[in-house]
């Protein structure tokens, strides 16, 4: 194997790792978002956990975050506006990445 082959394999492995980490972070963010929204909806315990799973599943409808936003926004109605939800999504993505990194160490 040449140095170029080694380098190519390293780049492919890094790309796959980064994609996996991003997927895990977004799934974790969606779960945290679901738990946050469930609290606003007055759900607790198993009902809140089930709602969080619904939010995670909503992300598989299309690429990007719009499907998750639509789900949460539609469910919350006037309990949270667009800016609040989108800001919470960004905050929770940072939190999710930090949680995942702390689990790796």
Regions found by a protein language model. Give the residues of each.
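A charge-rich, low-complexity, intrinsically flexible signal that marks solvent-exposed coils, linkers
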Residues: 1-105
